[in-house]
Amino acid sequence: MQAQEANALLLSRMEALEWFKKFTVWLRVYAIFIFQLAFSFGLGSVFWLGFPQNRNFCVENYSFFLTVLVPIVCMFITYTLGNEHPSNATVLFIYLLANSLTAAIFQMCSESRVLVGSYVMTLALFISFTGLAFLGGRDRRRWKCISCVYVVMLLSFLTLALLSDADWLQKIVVTLCAFSISFFLGILAYDSLMVIFFCPPNQCIRHAVCLYLDSMAIFLTLLLMLSGPRWISLSDGAPLDNGTLTAASTTGKS
């Protein structure tokens, strides 16, 4: 009897030690991720405050929309290399600078309310799907239920968007962006599962980069969905809003 109790106590200690090791890995991964996200959002805020005269940069340069592919290309590289992908500070800062500059220019062209909304929605989606990854775990039945609920919510959103009074171009942009965000959220859930259950201590940087790339792809797609139709309408000669007029007049006076 005492031997069984000793074995049970030893097992519980081993489980506690194993859980603590996983917890330290999670702390490292999410600390690196928060640093990357804070750097990108901070740099974007500096661009937005420092270059108010360039609000129409994205309106005058349609080709810049292609830079939304930067995080997608980075994601393709990380998944293609897999465990052979380097996991060091050099790789971290290469991905960080490439995606931060892209996001900064997108933010420079956006309105303040769009930026705040995109920030909040990106963080909310990240927290929600990280929680779903913990909730779903490795149980396929749970993931089937989660997928069904998400599909119903997505179809409801698309139905409301298509029945709105917006023009056909805005409806197309919203639909494409909604499907793109859903795809990136699926990848985010997968990466979160990898961090929770399969992340070794020597791969913390690589997994943090994967989470960062997923979040930046979602953030840029949200900016494109919320600001894209306005940029296109401005390029077609639509009148500027009060905020743009104020910025333009201030720049002209200076």
From Swiss-Prot:
GO terms for cellular component: host cell membrane; membrane. It comes from Human cytomegalovirus (strain Merlin) (HHV-5). The lineage of its organism: Viruses, Duplodnaviria, Heunggongvirae, Peploviricota, Herviviricetes. The chain crosses the membrane at residues 31-51, 62-82, 89-109, 114-134, 143-163, 178-198, 208-228. It is a multi-pass membrane protein. This is Membrane protein US20. Keywords: Host membrane, Membrane, Transmembrane, Transmembrane helix. It is found in: Host membrane. Coiled coil: none annotated. Its main location: host cell. Pfam families: Bax1-I.
